[in-house]
Amino acid sequence: MIFISVAESQQGRLNALYRGSVSATVLAPPFDSMARQLGLRELADLRKLDVEYSGTSIAATGGYVKSHPAAVESFLKGYIESLHFMRTQREKSVAAIMNYLKMKDRARAEEGYDYYVELMPPIPYASANGVKTILQSLAHQQPKAVNASPEDFYDMSFLKKIEESGFVKSLGAKSASTRAHDRKS
């Protein structure tokens, strides 16, 4: 059995699966429904398995984080703002999905939006249990992963600082004032 790395794009993984280059892969909406339409069978829905898994990560080297803390904080603020935009601007977000994935099928784009808006937290804190699941899955390749501490793989200090500064709450206030302005216009 050949299993393709999740480092590939979803479109690339779907193409490889359809061509028979791999036996299985991981797909999320809208690519999972595309696979079903092509006659491929779903083996499991990770959302229904009650397994916490860190599927989306933001990474930087320790050296970069130490030497460029302002850039790290600025990036994270932008990322948090984009998550807020996604949650509060459905139509624009669906349009962006269709544009960047070159999709014509609005229903599939909405399916992808609904999946990700539910999946992505307002503040992207790492999950110790999610990282532990990944470490356990790597144990056959990296025996040291079994005994590794999940906390050694992430630094939440920047996110805590951003949250404590009131930045995240201010996004909600901006949304409310924008909606009020839109109603007056």
What are these language model-derived features?
Residues 1, 42, 105, 145-146, ...:
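Residue-level detector of short coil/turn "hinge" positions at structural boundaries
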